Amino acid sequence: MTLNLYIYSGLGNIIAIVDSVREDISLDTEDVLNLQENEGVNFDQLIQVLPPQDPEIDFDVKIHNNDGSVASNCINGARCVAKFIEDHSLSASKQLKVNTIGGIWRLESMSEGNYSATFLLSDVIKPICISHEEMYVNLDCISLGNPHGVAFEETNPKLDILKVGKDLQNNSLFPDGVNFGLANKVSSNEINLRVYERGAGETLACGSGACAAAVIGIANKEMIAPVKVNFQLGSLLVDYKKENNMISAIGSAAFVEEIVIES
């Protein structure tokens, strides 16, 4: 069997995409792990693009983290999927509805290599305080199809994102793990963000993490939408409409390479 992997980057978040629309390919957790351990393919998430089961939807996707676990959302991956569909002419439309297990992505191809991903916020923010190495961490938690806990440095100085992120994966408050974001407020509409993703560790960028931090900033930190969220290799512009609970994230997506694996 020949497997073509299309590698994309969403602000440094490496996304491997599998075309299960034109090819009869289905990958499970073991296959995802094998690609890394035996084939030497490195990625943060792997996304299979599938034919839709619902005629009102353009495509379905299945998302795996690099530890093989199934993910419910990946906004950097969503933009990469939009570019992949455009690159391979899988749809003539620049506006798409894509189904994930965490909800519907509304994707749009924009100018200058940018793509937007819009989705419904169906959760509320829950503040919690946890103990970590003889100190307390104040987290605002929210689910965007996947769980997020965000700490702002102004109320949580001197946090080690790697230690806290790893510790949270074993916390009983998060039985399925959690994506941990550490945000630094630059201004009323800009933050710097680092994210420790469950199942992947710290990544160069996390789109859903950016959305979580922006929504929490708007709701609890007197921030003004849209919020520019900066990562090491670029930024996302995140908008949140309280009146309809819709979140949108605009940013770049880039094709990196195609990897062909024979088995």
Segments from the language model and where they lie:
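C-terminal domain-closing interface element
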Residues: 123-125, 130-149, 246-263
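Short, solvent-exposed secondary-structure boundary/capping segments
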Residues: 113-120, 247
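A glycine-rich beta-to-alpha transition motif near the start of alpha/beta enzyme domains, typified by
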Residues: 1-111, 150-263
